[in-house]
Regions:
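C-terminal motif of bacterial Sec signal peptides marking the signal peptidase cleavage site
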Residues: 17-20
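Extended ligand-binding regions for polar small-molecule ligands
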Residues: 22, 72-81, 159-161, 227-265
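Extracytoplasmic small-molecule ligand-binding "clamshell" domains
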Residues: 30-111, 251
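Short loop->beta-strand "edge-of-pocket" segments that line small-molecule binding or catalytic clefts
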Residues: 45-51, 147-160
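Periplasmic-binding protein-like
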Residues: 53, 130-137, 200, 204-242, ...
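Acidic, polar ligand-binding/catalytic clefts
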Residues: 80, 85-149, 215
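Alpha-to-beta junction loops
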Residues: 84-85, 101-110, 153-154, 189-202, ...
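Short helix-initiation/N-cap motifs at beta->coil->alpha
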Residues: 88-98, 142, 160-162, 176-190, ...
């Protein structure tokens, strides 16, 4: 009877130890999972940056198949100030947030407007661009100059963008959704669309660079604050990126990069 009792007690002690060890292992796993991206970047010396890679002048491939653009210059400068290198990963727009949440990259620096809906899924840094949407038509069009004018018109916008929201705010607008900006610019020039809505910086750059037979016809419809998106729970990383961005603005580096790509001073909030 005593042997049975001793054996039972030993079994209970062993079980308790196993549970304790299992608990510690789980705690370590949970702790590792909560490690801020800033630590991973510091260890690897690489900051993985995602964007579409097809959105000039923000992010696009040049003739040498190298990424360049405003977002690229901003990313490289932030990475330098964090003591790491930027690695660029081109991802389709509708896969950016999903890829971020799957840890395929560390940060999205790709003209993502800060919205309440997106803030449910990701955290944003301070805005690194303030811009706005505009109406764009063919050169001969003169009857679409304000948002109300798109009623009854075929309107091209990027699916899942704030431009889609702007277009859908007008009852009676025939809104067509696209995946690539180049596709709806082409449809506009080929008269399959009456008007498109997109970012004023992007459109002014592309009209000038590519000598497109289209024009911006409206004032800025709404101002958008563009932030860099990171996974939730990475407060240290967000703080470091914000600090680097502030330094860039204070020492004139940000303004220099902005003027390089857009030829004007940055738009205020």
């Amino acid at each position: 009877m005593k042997k049975v009792l001793i054996f039972s007690m030993l079994s209970l002690v062993l079980a308790a130890l196993l549970v304790g060890c299992g608990g510690k292992s789980k705690d370590k796993a949970d702790e590792a999972a909560k490690t801020d991206v800033a630590d991973r970047i510091t260890d690897s010396k690489v900051m993985k940056v995602a964007f579409e890679g097809t959105y000039p002048p923000f992010n696009f491939l040049n003739d040498k198949d190298e990424f360049q653009g405003f977002d690229v210059d901003i990313s490289n400068e932030i990475a330098k100030r964090l003591g790491v290198e930027a690695e660029f990963i081109a991802t389709k727009w509708d896969g950016l947030i999903g890829g971020l949440k799957a840890d395929k990259f560390d940060i999205i620096i790709g003209q993502m407007t800060v919205t309440e809906e997106r803030k449910k899924s990701v955290d944003f840094t301070d805005p690194y661009v303030v811009t706005g949407s505009v109406l764009v038509t063919r050169e001969e069009t003169d009857d679409i100059t304000e948002l109300a004018d798109i009623k009854g018109k075929k309107v091209g916008v990027g699916g899942g963008t704030t431009f889609e929201e702007v277009a859908n705010s007008v009852e009676g607008a025939d809104v067509k959704l696209y995946k690539a900006v180049s596709d709806y610019i082409q449809d506009l020039t080929n008269k399959r669309l009456d008007v498109i809505i997109n970012d004023q910086l992007l459109m002014n750059y592309n009209i000038k660079e590519n000598k497109l037979p289209i024009k911006v016809t409206s004032e800025i419809l709404n101002k958008d604050e563009i932030g860099m998106a990171v996974n939730k729970g990475n407060e240290v990383f967000v703080e470091k990126v914000n600090s680097a961005l502030k330094e860039m603005k204070d020492d004139g580096t940000y303004k220099e990069i902005y003027k390089k790509w857009f030829g004007t001073d940055p738009l205020d909030k």
